[in-house]
């Protein structure tokens, strides 16, 4: 185990636990799969593969722009890790001055969620440096560096339902219980994808495909270049399965944490000794439900089925051990019970696209709007200005017919620490969806979309962008930006 502390480049403190020993897999050779005819399920303008935060935003945005959209999702819900993964703590949507910069589709979600499905500071306190308010909200994952931020926790079931209703309202063809397999390639461009379901293998043909799988499954299988290096001293490469305990009194727990630091430290030390893998409880949207977003496990690959299975098993065992320890030692947890382990494993990193451009650590201090800015993300600390997200980070270096959005966009490993978060996935998803629709309408490849038109359409959909000088006319290929 190693402990990660908060610095100017990370938000949450936490422990990282190393993997168990991996058993070698026997090499048993290969079988030949004969060729076959595959039924065409649907033709469409835009196929979005993956219904997580970025894919949901992409589908809704493309449909709002007038495209015929199909959204393919392997689970029975939308929202991905923000719902099925129980990542219900939504990272900062305001900058360090309290300005809301994660807007557009994300803002629509929070405008439409019921008030009892969201917990967080009121707008009047966003950006506050009042010590009492910062202390209050820091225990509720909504204040960092002594500044109150809009970092709410949400009811995952309500977000599932709302996400589903929004895409249906927009006319998106929603396809659940379907797992994308291989991209369809025509003349060097992506022209759709095959997928598996209870009906067997079928195909969807599309003019533009948006890879919102989170792991770059489609662009990797289509031959696009990608990176998979990690930052060992951060949590961005770890995996775990989150869970919820109910029957708790989180106010008693927060009083214990806030007023008895020695007791809390002793509690955590005892938990590590008793459980091995150990995690502190986080607030949720309700006082009687506790969220556990760890323990974070290092050294596993999100692209290895044996590793994914091992993380699930370790996490489920950790949940049982935590329940016993918390019941005996944690104020407010005497009557706790298991209510849910996440249906989706918490993957933070697998692949990152090598794009025309990238979100780069070297630009953090610049504070200027890039010519092809499609979104703005809050910086990691008050030492840095807001960070510009370029359209080129969604566009593969060479591959046509496809855009990427979500945690696998083009960025370096430092920037991935925040670009993988839920709000940033909403930003890049909305940008990819609008760009895909504009590409179809103009009859051009996504890399040739007119940036002025793209930015105007994003502004019309409520996205926060900044004035910039000399917008590029398109995102053209250049030297690799993401090593």
Residue ranges and their predicted role:
Residues 49, 204-215:
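Short hydrophobic core segments
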Residues 2-27, 35, 67-68, 74-182:
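Conserved N-terminal/central alpha/beta ligand/cofactor-binding core
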Residues 427-443:
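Internal hydrophobic alpha-helix adjacent to the cofactor/substrate pocket in enzyme cavities
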Residues 211-226:
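Flavin (primarily FAD) binding-site architecture
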């Amino acid at each position: 185990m190693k402990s990660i502390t908060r610095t100017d480049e990370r938000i949450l403190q936490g422990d990282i636990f190393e993997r168990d020993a991996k058993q070698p897999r026997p090499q048993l050779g290969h079988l030949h799969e004969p060729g076959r005819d595959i039924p065409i399920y649907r033709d469409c303008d835009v196929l979005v593969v993956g219904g997580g935060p970025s894919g949901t935003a992409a589908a809704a945005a493309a449909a709002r722009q007038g495209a015929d959209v199909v959204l393919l999702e392997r689970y029975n819900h939308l929202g991905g890790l923000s719902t099925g993964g129980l990542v219900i703590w939504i990272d900062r949507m305001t900058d360090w001055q309290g300005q809301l910069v994660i807007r557009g589709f994300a803002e629509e979600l929070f405008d439409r969620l019921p008030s009892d499905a969201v917990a967080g500071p009121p707008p009047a306190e966003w950006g506050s440096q009042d010590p009492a308010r910062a202390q209050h909200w820091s225990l509720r994952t909504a204040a960092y560096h002594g500044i109150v931020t809009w970092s709410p926790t949400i009811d995952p079931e309500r977000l599932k339902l709302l996400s589903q209703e929004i895409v249906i309202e927009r006319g998106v063809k929603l396809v659940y219980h379907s797992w994308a397999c291989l991209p369809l390639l025509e003349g060097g461009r992506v022209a759709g994808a095959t997928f598996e379901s209870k009906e067997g293998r079928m195909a969807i043909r599309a003019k533009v495909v948006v890879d919102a799988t989170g792991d770059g499954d489609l662009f990797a299988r289509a031959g696009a270049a990608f990176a998979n290096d990690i930052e060992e001293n951060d949590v961005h490469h770890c995996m775990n399965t989150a869970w919820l305990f109910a029957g708790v009194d989180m106010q008693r727990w927060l009083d214990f944490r806030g007023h008895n630091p020695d007791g809390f430290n002793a509690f955590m030390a005892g938990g590590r000794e008793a459980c091995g893998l150990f995690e502190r409880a986080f607030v949720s949207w309700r006082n009687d439900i506790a969220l556990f977003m760890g323990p974070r496990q290092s050294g596993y690959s999100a692209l290895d089925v044996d590793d994914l299975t091992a993380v699930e098993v370790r996490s489920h065992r950790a949940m049982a051990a935590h329940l016993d320890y918390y019941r005996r030692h944690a104020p407010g947890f005497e009557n706790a019970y298991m209510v849910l382990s996440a249906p989706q494993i918490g993957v933070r990193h697998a692949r990152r696209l090598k794009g025309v451009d990238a979100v780069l650590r070297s630009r953090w201090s610049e504070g200027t709007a890039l010519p092809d800015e499609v979104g703005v993300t809050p910086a990691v600390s008050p030492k840095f200005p807001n960070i510009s997200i370029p359209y080129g980070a969604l566009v593969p270096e060479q591959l046509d017919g496809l855009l990427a959005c979500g945690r696998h966009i083009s960025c370096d490993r430092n920037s991935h620490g925040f670009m993988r978060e839920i709000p940033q996935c909403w930003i890049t998803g909305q940008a990819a969806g609008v760009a895909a629709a504009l590409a179809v309408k103009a009859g051009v490849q996504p890399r040739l979309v007119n940036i002025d038109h793209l930015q105007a359409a994003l502004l019309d959909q409520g996205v926060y962008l900044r004035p910039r000088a000399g917008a590029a006319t398109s995102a053209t290929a250049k030297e690799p930006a993401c090593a």
